């Protein structure tokens, strides 16, 4: 009889898979299900499923909307989660805004530019600090060629509505940002740039971008930096303060 023992230091795939009930089912042809689309959404382990069921069967209520027992418990859980997430990414709890997903989060930021611009064009008063969100014809928005549509289409829409110009940072044959390119490199960030939107880690290539370098160039000309961190936060330590981005979006449903 042959006995195979796991090699020390290697991941025990079967043990990990056992935590995910959906992986116990079979796929086409009766073969064991293999899931490789965690970049879109990750499957949920038993601990997460149990926690969600526990909330809905024991604590479900609208948060910050009541003083009864369930409302207090739900609100406490909600704010505890906010603190845990802030600790995870090196942020302050007051800086976190919960949205349905990262697409909505990025759209929320892009709408800030569209709305502030529309108000300014109609001569309406702007809230304190909103002037930096006003875009004028000839202002520029910089994106990269490796962006997910969620961090591209919103900026195309903003450019179309405001008259701003969309500029691109290119990608090398190796799948990295081509920051040294004379026309499509870091030099596209200039005194007309108002916002720079980029991914931290490509959902297609896995490339990790030099966010700090790009953010430094953007801030030097007064531009805001919007970072898509959906693929990086689940897979590596992320400190949003150290990265230097002004807005960072990531998704809870992709965390495993």
Predicted regions mapped to residue ranges:
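Pyridoxal 5′-phosphate
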Residues: 1-256
């Amino acid at each position: 009889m042959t006995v195979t023992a796991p090699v020390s230091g290697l991941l025990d795939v079967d043990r990990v898979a056992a935590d995910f009930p959906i992986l116990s089912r079979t796929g086409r042809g009766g073969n064991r299900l293999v899931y490789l689309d965690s970049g879109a959404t990750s499957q949920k382990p038993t601990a997460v499923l149990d926690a969600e069921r526990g909330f809905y069967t024991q604590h479900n209520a609208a948060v910050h909307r009541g003083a009864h027992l369930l409302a207090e418990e739900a609100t406490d859980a909600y704010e505890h989660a906010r603190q845990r997430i802030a600790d995870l990414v090196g942020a302050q709890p007051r800086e976190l805004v919960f949205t349905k997903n990262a697409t909505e989060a990025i759209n929320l930021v892009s709408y800030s530019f569209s709305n502030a611009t529309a108000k300014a064009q109609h001569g309406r008063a702007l809230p304190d600090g909103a002037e930096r969100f006003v875009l004028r014809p000839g202002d520029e928005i910089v994106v990269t060629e490796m962006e997910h549509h969620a961090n591209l289409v919103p900026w195309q829409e903003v450019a179309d509505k405001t008259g701003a110009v969309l500029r691109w940072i290119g990608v090398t044959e190796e799948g990295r940002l081509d920051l040294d390119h004379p026309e499509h490199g870091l030099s596209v960030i200039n005194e007309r740039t108002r916002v720079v939107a980029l991914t931290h880690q490509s959902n297609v290539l896995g490339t990790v971008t030099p966010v700090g370098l790009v953010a430094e160039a953007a801030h030097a000309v007064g531009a805001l930096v919007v970072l898509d961190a959906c693929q990086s936060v689940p897979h590596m330590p992320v400190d949003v303060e150290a990265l230097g981005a002004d807005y960072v979006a990531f998704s809870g449903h992709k965390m495993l």
